[in-house]
Structure formats: C-alpha cells, structure tokens
A protein has these predicted regions:
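Helical substrate-recognition/capping region of FAD-dependent monooxygenase/halogenase enzymes
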Residues: 2-14, 18, 33-34, 87-90, ...
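Core Rossmann-like FAD-binding/catalytic domain of the broad FAD-dependent monooxygenase superfamily
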Residues: 2-395
Length: 555
C-alpha cells in the first residue's frame, strides 16, 4: 500500500486541516512534529505556482528557524533591510527593524508563496503526509458518539463527488478569506472592502530606477503610486493602484504595466517576462470568533479564514503563521495531558486582538500610501516598526509601559555556556534542545541568578520548592563570569547540573539588564533569583521571583 493510500485509509486522526496553503501546511508540520496525526485536504486540484503572499517577517523567521523549517527559505529568498519612499526627487528610508531588537533576523525575506508551500510540503512529506486534492470537508459535527474523537467529519472529493466519514479530535479551518468552515460555523466576517482596484505582478524587470534592494513606495508625477521590491531569482514584485474602479475582470495586464510605468517616471521600466499577475481590491475583515465553542473548543479558524487585510505590508501570511504557532502547541499540550482544555480558549483571547491591531494599522498605512504627504507614511512606518516586523506582537493583559512582561516576545540575547565556553544565542540553545528531545513543544525556564556567589542558596531552594516538569528545560544565567568561582559554587552542591549554567558576560550582562527592568549592577543589593518561563512559541509565559514560580501560569 502506498503512502497516499495509507493516508486515505486513516479513519481516526487527531487533527483535520482544511486548506493546503502555507498556513495549513505549517499547522500540519507543527502537528506532526508534536506527535499528532493529521489529514490535510485542499479543494484545489493543484497547489499555487505563483503569486500571493511573499513577505516573511523577522519574527516569523525566528519561529520557523526554531521549528527547523527556515533553512530552504533562507537560501532562496531576497533579504530586505529597509523601507524607502520616493516622490519626484526626494527619497527617504526607514530601517526594517529597530536597532535595539536583538535578533538574527533584522530583515524580512521576500520569497514566492509557491516556494514557501513547496518547502513546507517537502518537510511534511518526511512524515508521510501529503495534501489530499481535490478534497474538502463538506460537513462536520460534534455528535457525542466517541468521547476520544468527538468530531464526525465528512470528506468530499471534488472530482467525482465521492465522500468518506472519519473521526477527529480537532478541525482547523485554514481555507482562506472565503472560508467554508467559517460559513458552516455561521461566524460573521466583519469589515469592509474598497472599490479601488490594484494590480500586482511578478516579473523580470529592466529599469533605471536606482533602489532595487528596498521595499520601495513610489509616488509618481501623475499621482499614481506603486510599491516595488526584490524577490527570489532576480524577480521583482510591483503593486500599483489603478484608476479604474469598475469590473476588475475587465482589466488587462497591459493596464497594470502602463500604470506601473507612469508611477516610476521619469525612470525607464521594461517588463521582460511576467510570471504572474492579478487584480485585487483592498479588503479588511476580522471574524467575530476564532472557534466554535468556549466550553470545549474543537474547531478553530486560522489565517485568512479569520482575518484579511491589504498586501501593503505583507501581514496576511505572517499573521496566519502567528495563529498556527500560537495554537498547535496548546493542542499538543492538552492532548498529552499536561494542560486542561481551557488552555485552548487562550487562542482566540490572544490572537483576535492581534488581528484587530493588524487591521487598524493596515487602514492607516493604506491611507498614507495613497496620501500626497510623504511624511505621513514615514511617520507610520517608524511608529509601527516593531509591530510590522512581528517583534512587537505581544499578548500582554495591560498596556503598562514595562520593559518586559508576560506575553511579550522572549528576547534572543547572547550568553556564554559555562561548560563549553562557547558564545550562543538563547534561541539557538532552545532550538538545539527542541531538536534533541521528543517533547517538541517544550517550555524553557530561565533563572536569572545575578551573582551566583550570593544567590546560590536561593537558587537551590527555588528548585526544591518547584519541581521542574519533564517538558521544561532549565537555564541558569549568572553575572558571575569567573569560571573558577562558578566551579567552586557548583562543587558545594548536587542539585544543579553544570550544563544548565550560562554566563551573562556579553554587553555588560544584557540578559539581566534586558529582562529585569530594575536591575542595575545589583546596586540595590538584591540578589533574589528571577524566573522567566518561555513558551513553545517563544513568548514569555510568566516572569517573577523564582520563589513564587508554580505551574499556575498554564491556563
């Protein structure tokens, strides 16, 4: 029996995923990495070969890298580090990521969605999972017949109309802005669409326009505006506003090319080969709910199925990926028995506000791009710099202007490993440990121990009071940098593994300074250890005195 035949015979699976685009493929990849069984279906006869979302932001790259899914994309895409704005003879630029963000990825990656999908499908194939085409979910219900697999799901083949019934624990609707899963759940998709038509094309271009390495927003001499940026294999994507608000099906490629040339005047532009083009109208929508039930959530919406916006800042793909990174580890943790089902309610609680922020920002950016005032766009790009790149996305419960708090992205600081003396990033430590363990969704516990000669007793007591679960990895970070001093402290106890110890000796103890707002070279004499719990999606799950840590941070 072939792999495809074996897949089609699976009548009981953990997750059914509807939609074989990048969001659905990422969900399937994470699920199988976490030990969950999946079937993924797509209504289309074949995958997309060109077009659609092509920006992968810095924060998304961090998460893909952490999951072992970034290598092929990084080798292929075009790296962009600046936004630029051009109007007649005046040009200006804004850095993609703020200088203070500590990360390997201070750039976005411009790469075709078909390449992203191909990379994710290749990784998924290593787990003997393929997208089943052209299949869809024609109906589903929680019927109470099987407590372990509570969902009855009917799959329908769009080629011959044949059907098959399977049982599942969860259903993920990753089926786009026109989501049939969302419609079957009768969840409203609130928002508005513009009547203004825009053209977009991917092409090989010869041009005298000088800025070929940035995301370039261009205001032409006749009021036409365009956006142009590099892609993989010397391709260029051009997006341009069209003057025609009529039937977009009547707009031809020549019109898009003509308006792009007008926007770029007086520069010469020649489209030598157009690989893909389309016409779109800006729509900004958010689903009122992301799940069917708060009592026992089993059906979830992800990606464009629960939010859509303009392609101006490439937020769609990245927001969808953020949904999946937030959700799948929670499902895995619940299914492993380490968390209550109520943890799944936090998916909508955390991700719905993010989509609302994306829409609010998108409306302002679109208006600024179409405005005659150059300063408006520059101001907004600087204002939303952290959010656009994804580094500023947070699940905070409040708006207090505290340096670091629960819900924020965990910083990727550099430390020195005590045992090996090697300099290493926190994210690289965590990725390596994820690769070496079967507990792929594991948490990480950072204990900031200050001067370990003063705090060792408190650190040991903390570990006696808090039993570290198997799904949590420990890292003790100390400002003590003399290996001999640390060795002496470790020799006097048996509770702490030397492999846990890292020295905060880079940039004057950047971990302590960056993660403990009140830290200032211990001038206040406080050496109480601070605990920081980092979730599988690399957000901070809890921060506070180590002596107060418990597993209560899990919903």
């Amino acid at each position: 029996m072939t792999t495809d035949e074996e897949q089609h015979t699976k009548t009981h699976v953990d997750i059914v995923i509807v939609g074989g685009g990048p969001v659905g493929l990422l969900a399937a990849n994470l699920a199988v990495k976490y030990g969950l069984s999946v079937r993924i279906v797509d209504i289309e006869f074949e995958p997309q070969h060109w077009g659609r979302g092509d920006w992968i932001h810095g924060r998304t790259l961090e998460l893909l890298d952490h999951s072992g899914l970034a290598t092929d994309l990084l080798a292929t895409g075009a790296r962009v580090e600046t936004f630029s704005h051009h109007h007649q003879q005046v040009s200006s630029s804004v850095a993609y990521a703020p200088e203070h963000v500590v990360t390997k990825y201070k750039h976005l990656l411009c790469v075709g969605q078909h390449i992203t999908e191909s990379s994710l499908q290749h990784s998924l194939s290593e787990h003997d999972v393929q997208v089943e085409r052209p299949w869809t979910v024609s109906q589903f219900q929680k019927d109470g017949r099987d407590s372990k697999y509570p969902l009855s799901v009917t799959l329908k083949n769009m080629l011959d109309a044949s059907t098959c019934d399977i049982r599942a624990k969860y259903l993920l609707g990753c089926d786009g802005a026109h989501s049939d899963i969302r419609k079957q759940l009768d969840i409203a998709y609130e928002g508005e669409s513009s009547k203004k038509n825009h053209g977009v094309l991917d092409a090989l271009v010869h041009t005298s326009f000088h800025d070929r390495k940035s995301i370039s927003f261009i205001k032409g001499p006749f009021g036409t505006h365009a956006c142009m940026f590099p892609r993989e294999n010397n391709l260029v994507r051009v997006m341009v506003q069209l003057s025609d608000e009529g039937d977009r099906n009547q707009i031809h490629l020549e019109t898009v090319q003509h308006e792009a040339r007008r926007a770029l005047l007086p520069h010469r532009v020649e489209f030598t080969a157009v690989m893909w083009w389309t016409i779109y109208a800006v729509g900004q929508h958010v689903a009122t709910h992301y799940t069917s039930s708060q009592e026992d959530p089993r059906i979830f919406l992800c990606g464009d199925a629960c939010h859509s916006q303009s392609p101006t800042l490439g937020q769609g793909l990245n927001t969808g990926f953020g949904d999946v990174f937030n959700l799948v580890w929670k499902i895995a943790m619940v299914e492993s028995g380490h968390a209550k089902a109520s943890l799944l309610n936090t998916y909508e609680m955390e991700r719905h506000p993010v989509a609302q922020q994306v829409i609010a920002m998108d409306k302002q950016i679109v208006q600024a791009v179409e405005s005659k005032e150059q300063e408006n766009l520059e101001t907004l790009l600087r204002q939303y710099q952290l959010f656009i790149s994804g580094f500023g996305i947070s699940y905070r419960n409040n708006e207090n202007n505290v340096m670091i708090q629960t819900g924020d992205r965990a910083p990727d600081f550099k430390v020195v490993h005590y045992a090996t003396g090697s300099k290493v990033r926190l994210y690289d430590i965590w990725r390596k440990q994820v690769e070496e363990t079967n507990m792929r969704w594991g948490f990480h516990l950072l204990v900031l121990a200050h001067d370990i000669t003063q705090s060792m007793d408190a650190v040991i007591k903390g570990f006696k009071d808090f039993t570290v679960p198997l799904w949590m990895r420990v890292h003790i970070i100390t400002t003590t940098v003399q290996k001999g001093v640390i060795e002496k402290q470790l020799s006097q106890q048996d509770d702490i593994d030397p492999a846990w110890i890292y020295m905060d000796k880079i940039n004057q103890a950047q971990c302590h300074h960056g993660l403990i707002p009140e830290y200032n070279n211990n001038s206040n004499g406080n050496n109480d250890p601070v605990a920081i719990v980092v979730r599988p999606d690399l957000h901070i799950g809890w921060i506070g005195d180590f002596s107060k840590l418990s597993l209560g941070f899990i919903a």
